[in-house]
Amino acid sequence: MENAKMNSLIAQYPLVKDLVALKETTWFNPGTTSLAEGLPYVGLTEQDVQDAHARLSRFAPYLAKAFPETAATGGIIESELVAIPAMQKRLEKEYQQPISGQLLLKKDSHLPISGSIKARGGIYEVLAHAEKLALEAGLLTLDDDYSKLLSPEFKQFFSQYSIAVGSTGNLGLSIGIMSARIGFKVTVHMSADARAWKKAKLRSHGVTVVEYEQDYGVAVEEGRKAAQSDPNCFFIDDENSRTLFLGYSVAGQRLKAQFAQQGRIVDADNPLFVYLPCGVGGGPGGVAFGLKLAFGDHVHCFFAEPTHSPCMLLGVHTGLHDQISVQDIGIDNLTAADGLAVGRASGFVGRAMERLLDGFYTLSDQTMYDMLGWLAQEEGIRLEPSALAGMAGPQRVCASVSYQQMHGFSAEQLRNTTHLVWATGGGMVPEEEMNQYLAKGR
C-alpha cells in the first residue's frame, strides 16, 4: 500500500498504527448488537445447525467403528470442559490483574481423530460431501445404518472422487485423515508455515501433500485451481465454506449440554465470555455462531490473533474485510502460531459475524510461548502455541473498565462470570516438538 493511502487509513483508523508496529492490541467492538438484530446478517439459521447435528448423529455409528477412539462417545467427536484454577492464579500473578469469575478450558486440542478444533468443521464437511454423493447414487438412504459406509463397495465408490483443501496444518490433517478413511483420493495444499510433523502424518495416511514456499492464501488459491480442472474433485474452501462453518457451530449446543451437566448457569446475572483463536475465521466464527444460538445475548465472544497475522481485527475494524490483507499494511504474516498464520480474513465470516463479536485482540508469539509453559507447569496440559491465543483474553477484559461500562456489567455480574478459553490444538504434537515449544517460554 503506498504511503498516501496508508496515511489516510491510519488517519481514519488510528488503531492500525499499533497493528503495523506489532503492538499487542485490544479492540472492543462498538458495533455489537443483540442476537436478534445481528442474526439475519449471518445468512444461516438455527435450522441449519440442527441439520448439522442430525447429520453428525447419522454418521455416529460409522465414526465409532472407523475410528475406535470415538467408540466410547458413540461416534460423537466432542472435547472435555475443564476448570483451570491454578492457571487462573498464575495469570493473575504474572499480569498483576485479578480475573473475576472462573476460568475454564475447552480442550478441542484433544479432540479425537485429528487433535484440533478442525476435527469439527473439517470432518463434518467431508462427511456431508460423502453423504451427498452416496444419496445421489442411490447407495444410501437417510434411515440406513451409516456404518455400512465401511464396506468395500463404498470404498470402491468413493475412490472415483477426490477432495482438495489448502491449509496451514490442522484443517489439512482433519480433512486428509477423514477423506482417506472414507476412500476418497485427497490432496492437501500446505503453506510454508505448516509443521513438518503434520505433513508426515498426512502422508502416513496416504494423503498427497503439495508444499508451497508461500503463505496460506497461495496454498488455498492453488488448491482451488487444481480442483477446478477435475469435475470429480471437490474443493473444501476454508475462506467461504458455509458447510465448514456449520460443522463448527454444533459446538454451541454441545457446550450448553456440558454446562448443564456440570451445573453451570449462563444467564443475565452469570455471563459467559469465550476467547477463540482466529486464523481465516471459519472455526471461531462457526463456534461463536453456535454459542450465540445456544446462549443468546449472555455469551460474549472475542477473537484472538498473533501480532504478525491480525487479519480479522484489521478487516472488521476498517470494514474492508477480505479487501485488505496484513501484507498490504506491511505486516509479514510470520508467526509460530501456524494455525493462525493467515494474512487475509474470510470475507464471509467477517461480514456475517461482525455484529455478534464483542472484541478482538492480538498477542505476540513470545506471550503464547510464555502461557504455553505456564499451563504445562500449573495444570499439566500441553498445547501448541496457537491454542494459547485465547488465554490472554480474560485479563484484557477484566482490565478494561470502558468495555465493562459499554455493556453495563456490574461488579456482581463480573464476579459470576465464566471465562472460557477455547484450546484449538496441540494434543497430537510430537514430544520433541513440544519440548522445543516449552523451552521458548519464560
UniProtKB/Swiss-Prot annotation:
Entry keyword annotation includes Lyase: yes
Task: State the superkingdom.
Answer: Bacteria
Which residues are the signal sequence here? Answer: none
Q: What is its EC number?
A: 4.3.1.18
Identify the Pfam families for this entry.
PALP (PF00291)
List every position bearing N6-(pyridoxal phosphate)lysine. Answer: 118
Name the cofactor(s): pyridoxal 5'-phosphate
Coiled-coil segments: none
One Gene Ontology term of the molecular function aspect: hydro-lyase activity
What induces or represses its expression, per the UniProt entry? By growth in D-serine.
What UniProt keywords are attached to this protein's entry?
Lyase, Pyridoxal phosphate
Could you give one GO CC term from the UniProt record?
A: cytoplasm
The reactions it catalyses are:
D-serine = pyruvate + NH4(+)
GO BP term, pick one: DNA damage response
Listed SUPFAM superfamilies:
Tryptophan synthase beta subunit-like PLP-dependent enzymes
Q: Which InterPro entries match?
A: D_Ser_am_lyase (IPR011780), Ser/Thr_Dehydratase (IPR050147), Ser/Thr_deHydtase_PyrdxlP-BS (IPR000634), TrpB-like_PALP (IPR001926), TrpB-like_PALP_sf (IPR036052)
Task: Provide the domain comment.
Answer: Crystal structures show a large (N-terminal) and small (C-terminal) domain; the C-terminal domain is mobile and can block access to the active site.
Q: Which family does it belong to?
A: Belongs to the serine/threonine dehydratase family. DsdA subfamily.
Q: Subunit structure of this entry?
A: Monomer.
Recorded protein name is D-serine dehydratase
Q: Which gene encodes it?
A: dsdA
